[in-house]
């Protein structure tokens, strides 16, 4: 916990960031580095349980420091890890903030597996219902990773984004295309 707190306190020493916070409001969603590099629901690329302890304890410590240093409204009192939410900007836009890192994300193996999840069923259902029921002119999806394919010489270049979860991405894109 102290390491995460120290990291956040160091970021806040940046005078340009201080000026930015003074002038503008923020809507935030964490990325993997708030926990550990290339993290997912049950672990992280650079998490070593023998040196760093239990992954769930580490996630909880990272979350606590995040919430101490980056104030956001509590979304679910029973699940502090639930950060996905939507924000309306009048009748012009509704921004849907996703969690593509911690809640349901599985390790990106077997990219074509039919049950692979980046955001999971609960968040997918929430997003689809929100998009369908929104009366805003613009519906914006804000999240941490690239949605569009990144191919180099026809080969998927980065599994650490929606490319690693092709079936779930297709399901979302199909929904958007069919509910325009």
Q: Where are the regions a protein language model picked out?
A:
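Metal-dependent phosphoester/phosphodiester hydrolase catalytic core
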Residues: 1-180
